[in-house]
Amino acid sequence: MIDKESKISQDSFFGHPLGLRTLFFTELWERMSYYGMRGLLVLYMTIGVVGNPGLGWSNIEANAIYGIYAGMVYFLALPGGWLADNLLGYQKTVLYGALIIMLGHFTLAIPLEQTFILGLAFVAIGTGLLKPNISSIVGQLYSAQDERRDSGFTVFYMSINIGSMLGFAICGYLGERIGWHWGFGAAGAVSYTHLTLPTR
């Protein structure tokens, strides 16, 4: 006969609500794709058009575009949060954000200069929808009196560190050693993975 403590351990994620497992892996895959792609951006924009061809832009152009992109990621969190609060709800906003991020990464994987800015725009918009709202869902897993709340956020934030480390390593290797668009495509594949893998 299974005692109560064993039953709780089977129906939890490191002693936390099972919903944290879904959010942990969603954030891990999203951060892996985001940082994996981000690590390639300036290199891809400034590398010449021979060999493993990039865009061949100047450092000034590349840094300006990178800065605008990074700024938009954080700015778009404001309308992303508003949409979740007032129109769509947190779960739908996170899902739509993940889908748009995936679309952006696959657009970046197309070896055309004309689609590059479009892909960046998709990733920025999707991140603005997903990033501010997924943490809110973590908070909703716990009551205000639940002592596990702080440690739950610690577990959740571990996914950010793990995902960023894997993203830089995997997408960076593919981008530099095989081809930039393989790195961008890997980021898209990671996005697809976190949308399709079973979470229970």
Describe every region a protein language model picked out:
Residues 151-168, 175:
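Glycine-rich segments within core transmembrane alpha-helices of 12-TM secondary carriers
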Residues 40-61:
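Short amphipathic helix-loop junctions that connect adjacent transmembrane helices
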Residues 193-199:
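Conserved small/polar residues in nucleotide/adenosyl-binding loops
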Residues 67-82:
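Central cavity-lining transmembrane alpha-helices of secondary-active solute carriers
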Residues 99-113:
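C-terminal ends and interior cores of transmembrane alpha-helices
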Residues 130-143:
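Intracellular juxtamembrane helix-capping segments at the cytosolic ends
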Residues 78-98:
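Conserved MFS/SLC helix-loop-helix module at the cytosolic interface between two early adjacent transmembrane helices
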Residues 115-130:
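Hydrophobic core of transmembrane alpha-helices in multi-pass small-molecule transporters
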